[in-house]
Amino acid sequence: YRLKHYPPISEWSPVFSIPNVTFINLQYKDFADDLAKIKDDLGITVHHFEDLNQYDDIDDVAALCNALDIAVTTKVTPMILTSAVGTPTKIANWQQSTWNNILTNPVSSSVDMFEKNTWEPWNKIFNLIAQDISKQKDSFNHF
């Protein structure tokens, strides 16, 4: 099921290859192996805040999401929080019926959906997302 609907970490490399970007993990499960693989394979550190309980402290997670310039995700829980606080959110997704399409939800006006057919490879989607972010990157609010 996961392989059909969610991309393997290796497919995210176009996004991780965008220069001068800091990456933050928003997943609430233990993805230490994936984060280590990104570091080992791509030389990119994805920061994970050990002191933030991303499962139970929804207010703190929402505050973190609000502090981001942009979020890239699949259709998982962090997407709901980033879009709810107004953070521009790029979603890598497979095409599906419109009955559950987040774009019809007015809370999610900050969402850009990048869709593929269910059995197509993910690389085209992540290349498009990386290109889109690269065009917008200079307008982000840096500290």
Label each PLM-derived region with a short phrase.
Residues 1-143:
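Catalytic machinery of carbohydrate-active enzymes
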